[in-house]
Amino acid sequence: MVGVETKVLEIRPLQRISFFNDLYRSGFEAVVIDKGQENHMSMSLFSIIEKPKDTSEIVMNPSLVRSANQFYQALVQHQAFPQMQDLMCKELYGARLLVPVADPQKTTAVPVLTTGKGVRYYPAFTDLVEFGKFDRKHQFGAMEVRFRDLKKYLDYVNGIVVNPFGFALRLDGEKLDRIEKENMKLKVVK
């Protein structure tokens, strides 16, 4: 994959660990230091920060965020492949997501995002950072859901939007059904 040129940004010493932790949340696994010369230095992100050992208690989807960002960047550059979209959908199907609720003790969802054309979306988030972009005033609780749970919200809205202030993946009922059909596997339950 061809790299994307970026601007230089100074990260002050007190912000560096947070910055590198956010890179992990966003799906990065390596850092390349290049001062515009032919030689560059590459290193694993985990030589800078400690990779979380157990993320089972934390809702975080670095692989989904990475695959979605790669797909949308390639789409803008007219270089997207169907396999990139398939990978993003596979990661979404296996993801644990957060949805806002008015009262964390209840499963009734309240907040809805509406487009200028009146299309209503229920937001879902890959992690607490993305959830925080939506709930800046801390008005809502967060409830963990799986992909299969998203369809129940379609009774109230036209679709689901994953990370509305990030890659903003919009999913209507047809797209949810297609992703489920393409990724559903027979599982043996013991």
Regions found by a protein language model. Name each.
Residues 1-190:
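An interfacial alpha-helical scaffold signature
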